[in-house]
Regions:
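Secondary-structure boundary elements
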Residues: 122-128, 153-161, 197-202
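Metal-dependent nuclease catalytic cores that hydrolyze phosphodiester bonds in DNA/RNA
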Residues: 1-148
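A generic structural motif
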Residues: 137-139, 152-154, 206-208
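Metal-dependent nuclease catalytic regions and adjoining charged, substrate-binding loops involved
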Residues: 180-183, 187, 192-281
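Short histidine-centered catalytic/ligand-binding loop motif
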Residues: 42-45, 94-101, 174-184, 222-224
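Residue-level signal for well-ordered alpha-helical scaffold segments within enzymatic catalytic domains
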Residues: 58-59, 63, 161, 191-195, ...
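Short acidic (Asp/Glu) and glycine-rich catalytic loops that position anionic groups and cofactors
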Residues: 34-38, 169-171, 210-216
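Conserved catalytic cores of phosphodiester-cleaving nucleases, focusing on short active-site segments
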Residues: 147-179, 193
Length: 281
């Protein structure tokens, strides 16, 4: 196992080892497939939400890609970043490892980062002795894997913590975030990080809402999530190894698929129309 502190973001993401993001991209549970994984491999990916997340990380952790505002003189008269000058400036900023944003878009970044640091539990976690942006490389089940902790603490009386900062456009409350965990496979990420590190550490998600008042919550996942994540991480590694060995990266099935309604839809139909029949009688 190799542990590297302060590895530049670009250097980490161009490494060939399988990451938890790649693992989830392989799995149909998260809308993935080997074909989608192969297509994305080696391609740079960015989005407005991705940029916001990276900028908040940098503001809270003090490391990573800093967000910088477009100069007014490169913007169009309506304020759009659509001019040739704006695009060239943005390209140069990204080349420097920074994130171009309009000045108005920087205010929520400040709001979110300040909200995280005001939250007593979140702040206490980030102030524990340890390191920020810790990159770990190892081998699990014969597959070379990697993980990048936002923060990894030293041993504390409560144990070693891996900490992951998430921004969300939904609520950060537990009832909502548990659905987000299932949707995006954060339980797979958590277990992937544990297995890559080779330690059964505690893992905390610090979640901040992306709209004012930028509410914050801190969550740990329970044992059922741990078991589910462990199973899916294993499935992803095995699938990756098989695809690599055969150089075959399948997408959707090629034959005709006969579909049946989901259980919830069938039950809703049955309840509605069974009730209608009773009323008519």
């Amino acid at each position: 196992m190799t542990v590297i502190h302060d590895l530049p973001d670009a250097d980490y993401h161009t490494r060939p080892e399988l990451s938890s993001t790649g693992a989830r991209l392989l799995l149909p549970e998260f809308g993935g497939s080997p074909a989608k994984f192969k297509y994305r491999q080696g391609r740079e990916y960015t989005s407005a939400a991705f940029d916001v997340g990276k900028a908040v990380h940098a503001a809270v952790l003090g490391v990573g890609a800093e967000a910088v505002a477009y100069p007014e003189d490169v913007l169009a008269s309506n304020g759009a970043a659509s001019t040739k000058a704006a695009k060239e400036w943005a390209d140069s900023v990204r080349f420097e490892g920074k994130i171009p944003m309009k000045a108005a878009d920087l205010r929520p970044i400040t709001g979110m980062s300040e909200a995280v640091l005001r939250h007593p539990t979140a702040r206490a976690l980030f102030e524990l002795p340890g390191h920020r942006e810790v990159s770990v490389f190892s081998e699990v089940d014969g597959v070379k894997v990697r993980a990048r902790f936002d923060a990894l603490t030293d041993e504390t009386p409560q144990g070693v913590f891996g900490i992951d900062l998430k921004t969300t456009s939904d609520s950060a409350d537990g009832d909502t975030f548990t659905k987000t965990v299932v949707k995006y496979g954060y339980h797979v990420q958590e277990q992937w990080y544990r297995e890559t590190l080779g330690q059964d550490i505690r893992f905390a998600f610090v979640v901040v809402e992306s709209t004012a008042p930028y509410l914050v919550a801190v969550h740990e996942l329970g044992l059922a999530y741990k078991d589910m994540g462990k199973t899916l991480a294993k499935v992803a590694r095995d699938l990756y190894a098989e695809c690599e060995a055969t150089n075959t990266w399948p997408g959707h099935p090629e034959d005709v698929q006969v579909l049946e309604p989901p259980v919830w839809a069938a039950m809703a139909h049955e309840e509605r129309y069974a009730l209608s029949s009773e009323i008519r009688i």
